[in-house]
Amino acid sequence: SGKWVDGSDAGAALVDPVTGDELARASTAGIDIGAAMAYARDTGGPALRALSYAERAALLGKVADTLVANRDAYFEIAQANSGNTKIDGAIDIDGGIGTIKYFARLGAGLGEAKMLKDGRLERLSKDENFQAAHVSVPLTGVGVHINAFNFPSWGMWEKAAVALLSGVP
């Protein structure tokens, strides 16, 4: 919880689809997924929801900056992991970066709010003494996203950016 944990066995080989060379190994053995979810739900979620939309958007902007700074390395990774051509990799990698930047701009435009007003005030009485407003607030919990293999960057960031901007880890 709150730290990186290595799997406790040899794991499965992740191989280059073109050469068959082993690139890495991955394992979830010995990893307490429930504890990871609890940490995200109980620590990460409240920390994100304490931030305004603009602050969450700024964090997304920093993620985008990091991805841009490492863009060339991602092409090599995309080719090794998926056999992508440079063009296929560019569509995926740049699509992911563009998606994060879009939601960062959108969130910045929402300002310092931590919830969104939905529509106008609704009168609940004959006069205006009793009114109500609908608001959209961040959900509590954890976003678990299943991603397609063909666009691992773009597909992941179109889900994660929305969740993170909304205050859901």
Question: Where would I find each of the regions flagged by the language model?
Answer:
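N-terminal Rossmann-like NAD(P)+-binding subdomain of aldehyde/semialdehyde dehydrogenases
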Residues: 1-126
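Conserved small-residue-rich beta-alpha loop and adjacent elements
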Residues: 117-169
